[in-house]
A protein has these predicted regions:
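N-terminal assembly/interaction segments in proteins that build large macromolecular machines
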Residues: 2-331
Length: 331
């Protein structure tokens, strides 16, 4: 059957598939346009399966809120290359999926994938994008925040977006909320405050802080003992340095062995007799510093470093606070 260029172009406009793929589909389906569309869809599904082991690390991350700011969503639509990820059609598709979530206040990723747009599920439309772009395309994330007021921030380039939910709507909240959403994008907090940090993370940070404190106290004692023996601690702080400095003639083999013995004995003695309360005091200080650096409300405000984010919010309204936030980034 003779397939015309007009037929090929029409199918291409309808599906976004490549010219040669459209021509092949029409030939295989004897010019039947609807059958050719199904053929291309099936091909897209096969492409998706064939590319299942490919990494889809590029794409678009975009957020938005409802007009009343009580619901916000951020999606991540992934592909393989920045070229496709920055393509207007790809970004447009991502925005379309996001708008569906916003308009219908969709709660989770599975519900969004199953949602129908013009008779097609979002999951099918994502598969179509695989056929259209020739790359593995995945809808990986839908994060949602519902609160009395939700602010969003989209970083330039569609690679990073945030949502921040507040416990109340107050006069002038737009500017304050936007600044906090920008802060969350820039400073990468892991939790709202200390109470929001998972217990597993708290336990891990405390264990690290305790061990680090003990080792530092032992090292201080070792350094004092080495100096008393006439050995520069910097020359013997590792086996590599010991061997290197012996080769340079900076220390003798006897000094190297003496340093090893001092390190072993003083470390063991220090750890055996260390004051646990002192260790816990220092470790608690380190964990508190971790909270200040990683919890949104306790971080120094990006706009005014003289106050925390909590203080920045309460400057606008004493009763206002953050009740939820999401931060999604490519990579």
């Amino acid at each position: 059957m003779n397939i015309t260029a007009a037929q090929v172009n029409e199918l291409r406009q309808m599906t976004g598939a490549g010219m040669m793929d459209c021509k092949k589909a029409l030939v295989e389906c004897n010019g039947d346009k609807e059958a050719a569309i199904d053929y291309l869809r099936k091909k897209g599904q096969k492409i998706a399966e064939k590319r299942a082991d490919r990494e889809a690390a590029e794409g678009a991350v975009i957020s938005a809120t409802t007009a009343d700011h009580t619901y916000g969503a951020v999606i991540m639509l992934n592909c393989e290359t920045d070229f496709v990820g920055s393509n207007a059609d790809f970004v447009g598709a991502a925005k379309g999926f996001l708008q569906a979530a916003i308009d219908n206040k969709i709660k989770n990723l599975d519900a969004l994938k199953a949602f129908t747009i013009n008779g097609r599920t979002v999951n099918d439309l994502v598969t179509d994008l695989t056929a259209k772009t020739g790359e593995k395309v995945e809808l990986k994330h839908l994060e949602v925040v519902e609160a009395p007021y939700v602010a969003n921030y989209n970083h330039q380039g569609n690679r990073l977006a945030t949502l921040v939910g507040f416990n109340k709507n107050f006069n002038g909240i737009e500017e304050t909320a936007h600044e906090v959403a920008m802060h969350a994008a820039a400073m990468s907090p892991i939790a709202i405050d200390e109470n929001d940090v998972p217990q597993e993370t708290k336990d891990r940070e405390m264990a690290v802080a305790i061990e680090k404190t003990k080792q530092e106290q032992a090292q201080k004692a070792v350094d004092v003992a080495l100096k008393k023996a006439g050995i520069n601690p910097a020359h013997v702080d590792s086996e590599d340095h010991i061997n290197s400095n012996m080769a340079k003639g900076w220390i003798t083999e006897a000094q190297a062995q003496q340093a090893r013995e001092i390190r072993e004995k003083v470390t063991a003695d220090t750890l055996a007799n260390i004051k646990e309360q002192m260790v816990m005091n220092i470790a608690n200080g380190r964990v508190n510093k971790f909270f200040k650096e990683n919890c949104l409300l306790d971080q120094a405000s990006l706009l005014d470093g003289s106050m925390t984010v909590r203080q920045f919010i309460q400057k606008a309204d004493k009763e206002a606070t953050v009740v939820a936030f999401k931060r999604v980034q490519l990579g």
